[in-house]
Amino acid sequence: MLKPIRFWVCLVLILGMPRVFFAQDKTPYRLVNPFIGTGNEGNCFPGAQAPFGMLSLSPNNTFDNYEDAASRPGYKYFRNEINGFGLTHYSGVGCHAMQDLQFMPVAGTLDKSPVNDKHAYVSRFSHEREKAMPGYYSVTLDDYHVDAKFAATVHAAIGEITYRGDQEAHLVFAPTNCANGIGDGELHIESTAMTVTGWVSTGGFCWRDPKDRPYRVFFVAKFNTKFSSYGVWKGKAKAEGASNVAGDDVGAYVSFGKLNGKAVKMKVAISYVSIDNARKNLQEEISCWEFEDVCRATKSQWERMLSRLTVEGGSESQRQAFYTAVYHNLLHPNVYSDVNGDYMGFDDKVHRVANGRKQYANFSLWDTYRTTATLQALIAPDEASDMAQSLLLDAEQGGAYPNWSMNNVEYGVMNGYSTFPFIANLYAFGARNFDLQATKEMMKRVSVKHIKCKGFHGWEHVEDYMAYGYVPVDRHGHGASMTLEYAIDDFSIAQICKAAGDEAAYNYYMNRSQSFEKLFDEETRLLRPRNADGSFLTPFAPNMEKGFNEGNAMQYFWSVPHNVDALTDFCGGKGAMEKRLDTFTSQVKCGWAPDVPYYWLGNEPCFGSVYVYNFLGKAWKSQRMVRNVLNRFNDTPNGLPGDDDAGAMSALYVFSAMGLYPYIPGIGGFVVTGPLFTKVQLQLKGGKTLTLIGENAGNDAPYIQRLQVDGRETTSTWLDWNKLKHGARLNFVMGKGPNKQWGATEKDAPPSYY
């Protein structure tokens, strides 16, 4: 588990260690590039964050147009101005979120109010004088002649801000300039203590009003330099010398006089419970003023996490893309409890986690159950176990499991009830230190009756689903995709029930998991939206979005990972299925493409479709397509083919590059396609290692020629995790041309469940 960075980060540097923190090596840490995914696609941010950290201090450089996709993460690489630094960010999501408690170093005259005005205090910057690494961010604000650098811990951060010019130096607090504005807040200046504290109430994910499903976040900021003056803004009105302000239109500033090259140090921490808890977080994690000590401590955390999954071979660009993808999967969910264990529950009451545990928040579950859950269970099993327990606590406090949550609020922006496959994948791949029996009982409770989570979402239309065996499209516009997601949910619940020894419930949910068959349309051989009277949606076309959430009938056709055999039979057999898949994968779409009947790499429902060839005896075609997928990623700001969605897209890259994909939710096992790298090593609990050797592996050698598992030849395209989890060695021989006999027999195919 992550350990808080205690007072020891302030000890004297070990003799012989170089003063320069950033050694020029090629370790996994050094190969992470946080700017990947900050361009036109990805929606990532480059700022400083510890693994799964509550606080993420990152620049914001987007402005007024909230409907503009560019504003979603708070940062876009192609912009050349910065308007502030926020203390919370949500990586890769498709709507505006967080960017809370913005502040901005300013030099000169404070002649404008920053309240609800992102243009008030802005500086140009250059990427040549901008640097980002895990836990660290720095930039030069050209217009203010300011050099700013920041390092983060789990709950806090330290900054060193050098004002090089001869103008008055200030730091402006502009909390209204977060993603969606604020509904309320307070700022307090304690001039004698050189401290600023406060809180804001905000929310409004996906362009909503900040008073819609709000949360509160508290902060404390300390400085090592006396204030020469200070004041607040209430709306447009500036009050010099005032130290308190409250409302939904607040701002504040502290000034340091003319510094002429002197650096001001700032320490800041947040809490979702109280200002007092923010103080405790700061004291526990950064009690000193030594910037480099904090850097080293957080770097050590990142190195420890990143070293659990390593690769050799490939190009440096490919290794950089790989380690950055792993990094993206260590950002969220976020630690939500304070250093004393306090957290704000889904019942809006303060709770305390059990000793040795942490509460987590920010679950983009519709996205992350497909890939991220498995990756986190493999490389961070302790943290992943706490995530599963956190979701159970959320359900106990909020009435039901959240489906898409931010902090202690359910936003429910996607269909399905993806908490179930997320938890089932965590369990299947080794994250098992949570209350399995209570989890099983909660899953059973919320899957037979519509119980909302904190007043929202829950298993929507579950009564219709149980009555009809599907969700009618004339009762819910996404009825078809809901049915497919619910079938996966049922299968996942079944696996948890099986693990908990509840055979009757296992059989019940396994039967329910075949609900996708109710959408079989003999006329089109597609999974077609259906009305409550049993009729199919008319008119209808394969690329029609009606009935489907972010996709269409052809893109969702493959969304039956637990029973591909039944889907194949319905399609007309393996030949017909292969022909359809050939057409579907003949075009690869990135970005936004829900209305085309082809493989859409840019969104999650299509992730697994390229692996279906393994069920058809055509493993070589999956191998070819996976390499095609990998080539759509790179190590530039535009290096992701779609929203990263809290790591889901990046995790797809990781598994594709490993040549192992967790295809069936809730089942511990991988579909095999062969590695991109000559060596992959996964460190397992107990000191064991899973090693993949890729002889001849490379970008031009996507095809498996042979595979040995612990020295034994196999042609199976499915590897059972139970046979790998205690350590194993996979020896692949890769080649430039396909071995069409490898993985071609019926016994070589992955399993189907019915």
Stretch-by-stretch model annotation:
Residues M1-D25:
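Bacterial Sec-dependent N-terminal signal peptides
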Residues Q24-P421, Y427-L484, S492-K518, T524-L527, ...:
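Accessory carbohydrate-recognition regions in carbohydrate-active enzymes
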Residues D489:
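ATP-dependent phospho-/nucleotidyl transfer catalytic cores
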Residues P675-F677, N699-Y703:
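Short coil-to-beta strand junction motifs in C2/discoidin
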Residues L690-N699:
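Short aromatic-glycine motifs in intrinsically disordered, low-complexity regions
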